[in-house]
A protein has these predicted regions:
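Formylglycine-dependent sulfatase
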Residues: 1-397, 402, 411-432, 439, ...
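Residues forming the ATP-binding cleft of Hanks-type serine/threonine protein kinase domains
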Residues: 408
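Non-catalytic connector elements of ABC transporters
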Residues: 436-438, 446
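Short, charged, surface-exposed hinge/linker loops at domain edges
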Residues: 443-461
Length: 481
């Protein structure tokens, strides 16, 4: 594949099904739909941990959370574990970012030669309260949905600023005659809460026309005990009126369209400058969002709504209009980016578990590829681990019963078939895939030991519960509201 630039676009918390090109009945994403028509769309793409910081550390390093030890939103990526950005800087390449990274601090060597308006964790600390899991406190009602509906948030303005700066960056880059490829990473914050969106986007989704809620506990759905314990701690949905729940969905849909519009501006600038001829484009998200399904909001689980992400790649050498069903994950970004810019992986990089999305897109679907995710962060009573291979997804919990879903017969994961004796062989096979990657019990203990040490460092549980943002991370220059 010919070396080219790469424009890597990552949104925040975009549910993998909520794009037009993924067949959603309501959500409008015309710019991403166009990108998918020009390139390859992946239907089985996953985060490696369904919360911001661990997911972004996997993206940066090509390594699993249990390997890097960036367990939760209080342990942000600091560059100690080197990633693809470090490698490309060593090769003399231009590697720059605009927008949300959610690392520890701008002045740390995290693999970017320059950062524009970066969002990092507040005060270099993050959500210390989220490390309190052993045991999980009885409750800590979340403020994630304190704001819902039409309006103008700091996040909306921030995304416009990111698009503005990206368009200017591309214009400047088009004037450079150097043939060496560059990497530009864009980190948008939509559709992450606050669920506030400009009126014109909110009005696209009248609440009386919204699709019905899926797997509603108020209508008979019974949550898995691990998820129920999480909800008892967060207490989000139970404090919303029926109208607020609908408004939250409408606002989330609107944010999907809003971020699509900002991405469209950037893609138009890429074409207007002529850089589209030698630039490949990636679009994905750091994790998903429940958007009310199972009576949950935010992310933090390993169901499709929390762990699956949209993934579209386009450009020279990428099959146009293809739909790829091979399971992939964010840690594949390492090999994907090196592949795009023409850097051969060194001996250590060849041992990483990922593979280039460009190679995968050009191959037949691989039902044998195993994708792994894990969760050890805020609101979870114990570690959770996911294996996706072929038609099945296996979720293993420490201290709770496992789950098995047939994603072909049951794409909404409504029926756990783990206890069916006919599936005993599948259960054993998938648990072995998990144990080939890590020892889940030892990993759970390792995560909690490090989290308990962090809590002790900050004065114990009673003090730590109050340290860190209670909702969304503030944008650059903004104090927590």
């Amino acid at each position: 594949m010919k070396p080219q630039n790469i424009l890597y676009i990552m949104s925040d918390e975009h549910n993998s099904k909520m794009l037009g090109c993924y067949g959603h009945s309501h959500v409008k994403t015309p710019n991403l739909d166009k990108l998918a028509a020009q390139g390859t769309r992946f239907t089985s793409a996953y985060t490696n941990s369904s919360i911001c910081i661990p997911a972004r550390a996997a993206f940066a390093t090509g390594r699993y959370t249990h390997e890097t030890k960036y367990w939760d939103n209080a342990m942000p990526y600091d560059g100690e574990v080197k990633g693809w950005g470090h490698r490309l800087i060593d090769e003399g390449m231009r590697v720059e970012s605009i927008g949300k990274l959610h690392y520890r601090a701008e002045d740390l060597p995290t693999g970017f030669s320059k950062q524009a308006i970066p969002m990092h964790v507040m005060g270099g600390l993050g959500q210390i309260w989220g490390s309190i899991r052993d045991p999980l406190p009885d409750e800590r009602p979340s403020r994630m949905l304190n704001e819902i509906g039409p309006g103008e948030s700091n996040y909306n303005r921030y995304d416009r600023d990111i698009a503005d700066k990206a368009c200017s960056w591309l214009q400047d880059a088009s004037d450079i005659t150097d043939d060496q490829p560059w990497v530009l990473y864009l980190g948008f914050v939509a559709p992450h809460f606050p669920l506030v969106v400009p009126q014109e986007y909110y009005d696209m989704y009248p609440i009386e026309d919204l699709p019905p809620r899926m797997l509603d506990p108020e209508k008979g759905y019974v949550r898995h005990p691990w998820l129920q314990r999480m909800d008892d701690f967060q207490q989000v949905d139970r404090h919303l009126t029926e109208e607020q729940k609908l408004m939250g969905v409408a606002a989330y849909f609107g944010l999907c369209t809003y971020v699509d519009a900002q991405i469209g501006r950037v893609l138009d600038a890429l074409a207007a400058t002529g850089l589209d001829a030698n630039t490949r484009v990636v679009y994905t998200s750091d994790h998903g969002d429940n958007v009310g399904k199972r009576g949950m909001w935010g992310k933090s689980n390993l169901y499709e709504e929390g762990a699956a992400v949209p993934l579209i790649i386009a450009g020279d050498g990428v099959p146009a209009g293809k739909v790829c069903q091979t399971p992939v994950s964010l840690l594949d970004s390492y090999q994907t980016i090196l592949d795009c810019v023409g850097v051969e992986p060194n001996e250590e990089e060849q041992t990483l578990p990922g593979a280039s999305w460009f190679d995968i897109a050009n191959a037949d679907d691989d039902d044998e590829r195993v994708v792994f995710a894990e969760y050890h962060a805020a609101s979870s009573p114990s570690g959770a681990f996911m294996i996706r291979k072929g038609r099945y997804k296996f979720i293993y919990y420490i201290g709770y019963e496992s789950e098995l879903y047939d994603l072909v017969a049951d794409p909404e994961e409504s029926t756990n078939i783990a206890a069916d004796p006919a599936n005993a062989g599948i259960m054993a096979e998938y648990e072995q895939y998990l144990r080939d990657i890590c020892d889940p019990e030892a990993t759970d203990r390792d995560a909690k030991d490090m989290q308990n040490a962090l809590i002790a460092k900050h004065g114990g549980r009673e003090k730590a519960i109050h340290i860190g943002p209670k909702a969304a991370t503030p944008v650059p220059g903004q104090a927590e509201e």
